[in-house]
Amino acid sequence: KKKVIKLNGSPYDRIIEHIGKLPLVLSTPYDSDLIRETSEVRRKWIDGCIAQYSQEYLADLMVYNRILSQRNALLKSMEGHLNGSNSSLLDTYDNQLITMSKSLSQVRADFVNMFIPFLSANEGLIVFERETCSMTYQSQVLAVDFERTFLESRKKDLVTQRTNVGSHKD
């Protein structure tokens, strides 16, 4: 049976249309995973928060992930060998990922900067008395030489058959 989500009795054509309609971020004991787990867990949390207020960001993130998937599939099919047509397609994917990485990472950095005052104001609810909490966003994408770093990683990408640099690695 197909999952159906409705608002005021009207079903959405796509479930993604519901995201952001009820802007809510839930805090649970699992949030400690944000500290203990990998950067992927933290990225997903940030992405989920931003998606609550920016449909544009969510749409861009989905496009980025689709292009990333296509690039990774191409890298796998190339089996470490670069030829003319594959090189041209890889260039196209690279240009799109470089541009989108910069945009996505900047929105994430802006979110973290906007979230820090809320975190500071509510620190007492989050941590024990002798502890403090802080938050920073570190991204290779926001570095001045990101485009060069991305392009220089192509040899490694061909060997590993996946994209090793971009906003999906923040």
Task: Label each region the model flagged.
Residues K1-V41, W45-Y53, Y57, I116, ...:
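Nucleotide-state sensing region of NTPase/ATPase domains
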Residues K2-K6, R14, R36, R42-R43, ...:
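Arginine residue identity/basic-tract feature
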Residues E17, E40-K44, A59, R66, ...:
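Charged, alpha-helix-enriched surfaces in structured cytosolic catalytic cores
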Residues I35-E37, Q55-L58, R66, V165-K169:
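Short C-terminal domain-edge/linker segments immediately following a structured domain
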Residues I46, Y53-R108:
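Long, non-coiled-coil amphipathic alpha-helical linker/lever segments
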Residues H81-D170:
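Conserved NTPase motor "head" modules and their coupling/switch loops across ABC/AAA+ ATPases, GTPases
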